[in-house]
Every structure is written in C-alpha cells, then in structure tokens.
Amino acid sequence: YKRQLVFGATGNPFDPAKTCGGSSGGSAVALATGMVPLASGSDYGGSLRTPASFCGVVGIRPSPGVVAAEGRPVGLLPFSVLGPMGRTVDDAYMLLQAQAGTDPHDPFSTAPITDLDSPLEQADLGSIRAMITPDLGSAAMSHAYSSIFADRTSHFRHHFATAIDASPD
C-alpha cells in the first residue's frame, strides 16, 4: 500500500487489497482509473517504474539532469530524477518533452534534448547473449506464473544469439 495519514492506503486499481507499488503509486492509480490524463513523479530506486508496472501504465525514468529539479538534495544526484507517467508510451513521451530542459535553480540540469523524437537505431539482437530469469533468483513464483513467463519469453528468444535460463548469483 501507499499509506497517507489523512486518507489511508492507496490500493492497486485492479485489486485494492494489493499494493499500488510505491511512492508514485497515487499518480499511477489516478492514471489507471482515468482520474488524470498525465502524471509526474520522482524515481530514486523504482518509484516511477514500479507503480507504473503494478498499475498497468507507463513510467519513464529519464537520465539525470534531463528533467530539472529545483531543490533536490545534491547528495541524491544522480540517483533521484523526476519523470513522466502516462497511460501510453506516447502520452508519457509527450509529457517528457514538456518536462525536459534546463532550470537556473538546478545546476545539474542539462540542455534540452532536441532529438527525442528521432528514430532509434535498430539493435542487432542476433549478436547479444541474453539471460532470461523469471525471478532474479530471489522471488518465489507459482507454477502458473512460471508457465506464463516461459510461454511469453518463447516468442522472442530466437532473436538473440544465445538465450539461457539462469538466475544471477
């Protein structure tokens, strides 16, 4: 849960008894339930991305300095960043374009990125060795989820030079 003293816990939009994923969870729930069209949040260790994934929306963690943040403690740089959330990648990207830029009160902010909408280079996945793990070796998974994961990953394994099932040590 995301707990707030006045209003209580914010539950997951798919099952209110479960967590919304973290500190930007209220924004993710508001997006998922149609309360707002766009939202922003901060990300230190997954605070945008985790709630977005738990709530079925998109969260982007920009590189440090892309979105200026006046008043951010210097000790948290470059780990803490501000970023967008949206219902779709296009929505989140649109907000990122609006957020990106410099601020005279943030000495770590970077010059605006002018090529955010340039096409990405095509990656040659055929030269990449991939390790595929459903649980990173530390999270218990039910047989049902393991089966779903195996089915889903079977659709893209062939794109890699090598794809092995393993977990990090």
Where are these regions (language model features)?
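Beta-sheet entry/capping signal
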Residues: P37-L38, R129, T162
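Acyltransferase
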Residues: L116-L120, A144-P168
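Residues at alpha-helix termini
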Residues: T33, V58, A123, H159-F160
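A short helix-breaking turn/cap at a secondary-structure junction
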Residues: R61-S147
